[in-house]
Amino acid sequence: AGFKAGVKDYKLTYYTPDYETKDTDILAAFRVTPQPGVPPEEAGAAVAAESSTGTWTTVWTDGLTSLDRYKGRCYHIETVVGEENQYIAYVAYPLDLFEEGSVTNMFTSIVGNVFGFKALRALRLEDLRIPPSYSKTFQGPPHGIQVERDKLNKYGRPLLGCTIKPKLGLSAKNYGRAVYECLRGGLDFTKDDENVNSQPFMRWRDRFLFCTEAIYKAQTETGEIKGHYLNATAGTCEEMMKRAIFARELGVPIIMHDYLTGGFTANTSLAHYCRDNGLLLHIHRAMHAVIDRQKNHGMHFRVLAKALRMSGGDHIHGGTVVGKLEGEREMTLGFVDLLRDDFIEKDRSRGIFFTQDWVSMPGVIPVASGGIHVWHMPALTEIFGDDSVLQFGGGTLGHPWGNAPGAVANRVALEACVQARNEGRDLAREGNEIIREASKWSPELAAACEVWKEIKFDF
């Protein structure tokens, strides 16, 4: 029998409301906004088709394979409450559609061409369920939370960081000086800004050398292990690896990568190198807002966060809940759990559409950074808990007495909050009081409290 040529509705093949999802399926929740006149079933089925085996017309070669085995299926559709003409379409993809250990391939399918599809006004990937049968094909984070604490010998509190500012324009020697002052004052880490790569005013090798000198000097004087996130992001993968190898030769504990601008392929290679060579890997999410900021189109950050845990990174920026960058508390805590925990229950109030079981993949430490200062410390300690990095750029370097006192102020504020919490005090209610008490015996903290007493980024 010849095949039946012509165009037929996607929903005849790809909308299967009776389908029972398999444990090995990758599940996706899409927020679909169909064009006027396109029924939601057709829109959901179109997404399933275009992101798996479908094309716009029936083709003769369909007969050479088993669509039933390989097609994506839209198995459930629900209306989004409070939005006009928006639906959540749930799609199940058979495991065989994806190359093992490749976030790149997973995204090329799931969020590839389908996002330019005419029948849809907008499309957003809200969440993915990664089955253990797929996640087990990834190395994941180079080290994870416990190994990092053991390497650094730091327990029972959040870690403190600072991005060196001005982010562009300092010479390598002045940059190293700022690193030393911050680490000497009491921070655990300092950070290259995400756009510091290797520019004419400061070439990467000079920066690496001066920062390493700063790290070793601060370590010797404080008796604590210190780190600086040396940004290895580069224009080619070869150049990126060259920078990572040089960092390893210098004996530093941690390097950094911009995983979205650098790309998942480069990031995964770097993560493998970091595990093999004992380097921690700090991940910055520059470019994420291009993808995740629109509520009806793109991808939610929780998907980018899951992808990073698979590709590999030990720290990732994840919003602050309290600073200058967007982030709603419950949603933020939702993806913070997805980064850190082994097993996360489905919870729609926190934006988690699927129960996610990471089995034993190491966790990633969330980094809170952006417009935060000493008065935020109690809230940050309570919201993020011990397994986090709190990063104060302006909140350290903007101290009226300089960088080292700025670092002292942050460390004193943090230790005061941790001690108060361990004594059973309520950080949410008594936060300001705790900071005030601590500032009585720390002039550096008192000066910081004075400068930032009124600032809030409310819009």
UniProtKB/Swiss-Prot annotation:
Top-level taxon of origin: Eukaryota
Binding positions (substrate): 113, 163, 167, 285, 317, 369
BP-aspect Gene Ontology terms: photorespiration; reductive pentose-phosphate cycle
Cofactor or coenzyme needed: Mg(2+)
Cofactor: binding details: Binds 1 Mg(2+) ion per subunit.
Modification N6,N6,N6-trimethyllysine occurs at: 4
Subcellular localization: Plastid, Chloroplast
Gene Ontology molecular function terms on file: magnesium ion binding; monooxygenase activity; ribulose-bisphosphate carboxylase activity
Keyword Transferase: no
CC terms in the record's Gene Ontology section: chloroplast
Sites annotated Transition state stabilizer: 324
Catalytic reactions of this protein: 2 (2R)-3-phosphoglycerate + 2 H(+) = D-ribulose 1,5-bisphosphate + CO2 + H2O; D-ribulose 1,5-bisphosphate + O2 = 2-phosphoglycolate + (2R)-3-phosphoglycerate + 2 H(+)
Binding site for Mg(2+): 191, 193-194
Location of N6-carboxylysine modifications: 191
Enzyme Commission number, as recorded: 4.1.1.39
Family, similarity comment: Belongs to the RuBisCO large chain family. Type I subfamily.
NCBIfam families: PRK04208.1 (NF003252)
Subunit structure, as described in the record: Heterohexadecamer of 8 large chains and 8 small chains; disulfide-linked. The disulfide link is formed within the large subunit homodimers.
Function: RuBisCO catalyzes two reactions: the carboxylation of D-ribulose 1,5-bisphosphate, the primary event in carbon dioxide fixation, as well as the oxidative fragmentation of the pentose substrate in the photorespiration process. Both reactions occur simultaneously and in competition at the same active site.
Note: The basic functional RuBisCO is composed of a large chain homodimer in a 'head-to-tail' conformation. In form I RuBisCO this homodimer is arranged in a barrel-like tetramer with the small subunits forming a tetrameric 'cap' on each end of the 'barrel'.
Name of protein: Ribulose bisphosphate carboxylase large chain
Protein source organism: Nypa fruticans
Taxonomy of the source species: Eukaryota, Viridiplantae, Streptophyta, Embryophyta, Tracheophyta
